Amino acid sequence: MGLFRRLLGGRGADNRSIKPQRLDYLNEALALERQGDYDAAITSYRLALRDHPREPRILQNLAIALSRTGNSEDAIRHYRLALEGDATLAGAHYGLAFLLIKRGDLDGAAEHLKAFLGNPPRGVDAQKWIGHAERALRDLEASGPSERSAGLEGA
């Protein structure tokens, strides 16, 4: 009779202990991003933020996905929110720096490149990102203050 009760919507002893489970939106978002479905990943990251509204790593990953879809302003906002929660997130400093360069905020970009290089990531690909950041910072410093201000006027 337990089977019939469950089929008909009755409450059997078996389903009293069953609790609804929430989806793991963060892992879903990461998988969608790996598949290249950035719009769906953004939706999943936003759903993950409902459960963990100020989680820096979710905010950082959302910012990465937003930047890949060309939504630079939202990406910048989410990188900044991530850094408010954890100022040591190297990836957030790195991503924010290059978005600020595109925007023309070269002084802000230099600040975030220095923060990234002050606490660089470790791992297999880390040297590639570190080298890229070092070159970008050298270029910014070589441009001097007058060129940096001119870059802001053109933005």
Model-derived regions, located:
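Alpha-helical segment of the N-proximal tetratricopeptide repeat
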Residues: 17-54
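TPR/TPR-like (Sel1-like) alpha-helical repeat modules
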Residues: 98-125, 131-138
